[in-house]
């Protein structure tokens, strides 16, 4: 499990990205890089990390499911992910 503070920080970044998305879009189209630079650093979408919704793990996360590889495998083998089954050929 990731530290709660790390997960909370990432959630705060998500909120900031959502809040400033329209303003950032306008400034980019206008080419006003000085005003863009004055926006909060964490309002940039590239600072948000995809994290597992169950464990908060930041690496090995399947974006489609929002789960890290460990939880994905566990839930898939338990049959809790609809439409997912173990491959065999």
From Swiss-Prot:
GO terms for cellular component: cytoplasm; small ribosomal subunit. InterPro entries: Ribosomal_uS14, Ribosomal_uS14_bac/plastid, Ribosomal_uS14_CS, Ribosomal_uS14_sf. GO terms for molecular function: rRNA binding; structural constituent of ribosome. Pfam families: Ribosomal_S14. Keywords: Ribonucleoprotein, Ribosomal protein, RNA-binding, rRNA-binding. Transmembrane segments: none annotated. The keyword Amino-acid biosynthesis does not apply. The keyword rRNA-binding applies. SUPFAM superfamilies: Glucocorticoid receptor-like (DNA-binding domain) (SSF57716). PROSITE patterns: RIBOSOMAL_S14 (PS00527). It comes from the Bacteria. One of its GO terms (biological process) is translation. Part of the 30S ribosomal subunit. Contacts proteins S3 and S10. Binds 16S rRNA, required for the assembly of 30S particles and may also be responsible for determining the conformation of the 16S rRNA at the A site. Belongs to the universal ribosomal protein uS14 family. NCBIfam families: PRK08881.1. PANTHER family: 30S RIBOSOMAL PROTEIN S14, SMALL RIBOSOMAL SUBUNIT PROTEIN US14M. This is Small ribosomal subunit protein uS14. The lineage of its organism: Bacteria, Pseudomonadati, Chlorobiota, Chlorobiia, Chlorobiales.
